[in-house]
């Protein structure tokens, strides 16, 4: 399950030599299939600072009691290439004091999506370091 897989970072972008142009290419996301020129490697850049804050949308309303709890994310496939906006949402129904990947800190400073009593409000999360620190295998 997603809850048992620790998050070690968030993809910030990739760098590769494009097959068609043979020139260095940067992309903010990885979209399969990307085959670099001459079967070279793709270099991934990952934000792995455990206290990095991220803004994410919720899939349901949040209560104040849910702040500082941990949550898993639903990875949806409806994101867009043109804006880079993800459709991943924080699974509010799946919460635990310490076992899931993301810890909800507070509502985000987003005036248009700040109502925590509504689904898809913007909240601030950080990685839950409990999974990394207590991982035994």
Model-derived features: positions:
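Surface-exposed, low-hydrophobicity beta-strand/loop segments enriched in small/polar/acidic residues
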Residues: 1-137
């Amino acid at each position: 399950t997603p809850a048992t897989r620790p998050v070690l970072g968030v993809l910030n972008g990739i760098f590769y030599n494009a097959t068609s142009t043979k020139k260095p290419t940067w992309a903010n996301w990885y979209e399969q299939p990307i085959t670099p020129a001459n079967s070279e490697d793709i270099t991934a850049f990952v934000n792995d600072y455990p206290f990095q804050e991220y803004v994410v949308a919720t899939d349901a309303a949040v209560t104040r009691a849910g702040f500082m709890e941990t949550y898993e994310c639903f990875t949806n496939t409806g994101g867009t290439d043109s804006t880079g906006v993800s459709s991943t949402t924080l699974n509010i129904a799946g919460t635990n004091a310490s076992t899931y990947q993301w810890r909800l800190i507070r509502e985000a400073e987003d005036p248009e999506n700040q109502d925590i009593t509504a689904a898809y409000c913007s909240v601030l999360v950080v990685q839950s370091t409990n999974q990394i620190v207590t991982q035994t295998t």
